[in-house]
UniProtKB/Swiss-Prot annotation:
Pfam families: Ribosomal_S2. InterPro entries: Ribosomal_uS2, Ribosomal_uS2_bac/mit/plastid, Ribosomal_uS2_CS, Ribosomal_uS2_flav_dom_sf. This is Small ribosomal subunit protein uS2. HAMAP family: Ribosomal_uS2_B (MF_00291_B). The keyword Ribonucleoprotein applies. Keywords: Ribonucleoprotein, Ribosomal protein.
Amino acid sequence: MALPEFSMRQLLEAGVHFGHQTQRWNPRMGEFIYGDRNGIHILDLTQTHPMLEQALQVVRETVAKGGRILFVGTKRQAQKPVADAAERCAQYYMNHRWLGGTLTNWKTVSNSISRLKEIDEKTADGSLEGLTKKERLGMERDQIKLQASLGGIREMGGLPDLIFVIDVNKEDLAIAEAKKLGIPVVAVVDTNCSPDGVDYIIPGNDDAARAIALYCDLISRAALDGMSTQLETAGVDLGALEEGSVEEAIAEEAPAAAEEAPAAEPAAEETPAAEA
């Protein structure tokens, strides 16, 4: 495997260059804006391309060292691409709603994850059948709520080593928590956003479905490349694996790697979106 390649044409076709209406711009993004067209800011893809490449490199290196990546995208059009991409590369995601303290109060979040696993086990072994109807319905409601909020991080086993964010305005709390703990942030930053707090900026449209799908696919493939490197370092002969089984081997290796990796300690639609 190798770091994923992408072309300027792919960025154009996905609408990565379309920003927001000119009156909604954030001056902090001025250096990344090429110009405007019909009242819409146009991002400079000659800057986006190398900055996206750098972000992919960081993702690959993080995973190759056994690090965890947390995909964060809770807006409607990002929810499915974020979940699919994270699952494809055996990483983790938050795509429902960012819960305050997810990173800075990890101990409490871990307790909630344990609760979710406990309910899942009781559901699987039939233990819920011995409860009253009211108790059973209460547990089922808790299960649905916890799965939606924490299902994507239930196997993370500790704090992530890097987070990848779609829409820094919407996910400002996640970024603030990551910065407080010194966790690097890779993020897509649109023309109406501030890049403050983002370590690896990807100037680009954060609303168009095709653009979001492209970012998520590239980040996922970079993570897979990193995990491939990790397996090779561990002595796994990837060339001997059957075609199509590399990703399965990577996915099987991920839980063990997550358990072994030391957990950081907390200190604490295809067109420019006018009114996202």
